[in-house]
Amino acid sequence: MSRLAGRVVFPGEAEPQSSSTNSRAPESSSSSQETRQQNLANRFKPSNNYRSNRNQVEDGETTNSNRGKPRGKGPIRYQGNYSDRFVGRQEEAPRAEKSERSERPQRSEKPQDQNQREQVKPQRKQTKRVENVVASEELLELEDIIDQISDLNVRNDRSAAQIKRNILGSHDLIDTMDEDDWQKVCESMIKTALEQGEPEFIADLMVALFSNKLFAAVMSDELMKYVTKYIMEDDEMPIPSLLSAILCAHWPRQLAKAFDNINPILYTIVCLIKGWIEVVREDTERYYKEEKKPKYQVAREDSFEEPTPEPSKEEEEKIIEEPEMVNRCAVGLSDLCDTAQRQLWVNWMTVTDEIYQCIKPSITHNPNITGSVKGRLLDTFLQMNQWTKNRTASVKHAVTQTVGTSN
C-alpha cells in the first residue's frame, strides 16, 4: 500500500466526517499553523483512513467488495475491470437470438395420422419386375416354341428372359411333347447357338429345361451327333464355343456334376473332351513318353519286390489315328480353352489339368501336328499359365531421362 497523504474519494460515496486531523475550517491563525504542522507529520506515518473508509456502508449506498479499488493520490474515478466490458455484450447476444427466432416463420406441425403422412410424403414408383410388366405369351403348338428360339423376326421384339418365360409357361404343351418333338426343339436350339452366335442363351435355356428328363436325354444325343460330325467331317461350326458355354453355365450345385445319372448333358460333353485328349496324348506317346518319377519307399527287412504288371493286349494294340484327326482334336482343345478362359479352370479343374498336361509335350515332340496348330496350342498354353496366378498388382518402376537443350 502506498503511503500517500491524500484521500481517495469514490463516486457515490459520502465524504467522511471531519476529524481533528483533516478539518479545514479556519478558526484561528494558531490553529491553522498547528494543523499544517500536524499534516506534515502525518505524511510520514501510515494512515488507516483509506482502509476505514473502504468498508464503510452508508444509508442506501453499498460498495462492491468484489472489485479491486485503485489506489492513488487525489480523487480517482473507478471505471471497472477489463472483463466488465463484455458483460453487456453477453447479455445482448441471447436477446438477439430470441428475437431472430421469433421473427422466423414457424414450421407446420408434423402430421400425426398415417393418412396425413402418406399425403405429405412424395410417393415413389416402385420398381416392377419384367413378369409384372410384360405378360407371358401362351404357346399352343410346337412351331411356336421353335419360332421363339430360332426365328429372328419373332425374337427381335422379345428379350431372352421373356422367351424363356414363354417356353416354361406353356406347361400343357411341354408335358405332351414326345421324343420326336424334343428332337426338333433340340436341333433348333443347337443351330441357333452355332449359326446365330448365341451359345450363352441356348446354354441358359438348357438349364431351365433340364427338369424334363426326356429333353436331357435327347439333347445329350444331339450334342454327340454334332460333335462327331465336327471331328470326323472337319465341320467348321464353332462346336467348342457351345461346349464351353454349356460347361460354364449357371447350373445348380446339385446338377453341376458330370455323372450319367445326375446330368447326362455334362457327362456327354466331358466324355467327348476327354476323347480329344486321349487322341492327342496317344499320338504324342509314339514319339515321347514321360518317365514316371520313382515313389519314395521305406526300406524294411520284410519288404518284397512287387511283380511288375505285364502290358495288356489293349495297350500293345493301340489305334493309330490319322494326323488330320489328331490336328482337329488339338484345335478343338485350343478353341475350348480360348472361349471359356479362366472360367473353365474354376468350374472344371481336373479337365483343365488334363488338357494342360496334354498340350505341352504335343508342342515339343509330336511331328504330326502342323506348325499352325502348334502356334495355337502355344498361345493357349501361355494363357493357361496366367489363369492360376493371383490377380495382385505388380510393382513397376518407371524412369524418365531428360536431355538438356543447348542455348
Curated annotation (Swiss-Prot):
Region Disordered, annotated ranges: 1-130, 298-318
Annotated protein name in UniProt: Uncharacterized protein B0303.14
Low complexity bias (residue ranges): 18-32
Residue intervals passing through the bilayer: none
Signal peptide, first to last residue: none
Organism of provenance: Caenorhabditis elegans
InterPro entries reported for this sequence: DUF7627 (IPR056044)
Ranges of Basic and acidic residues composition bias in the record: 86-121
Biased composition (Polar residues): 33-55
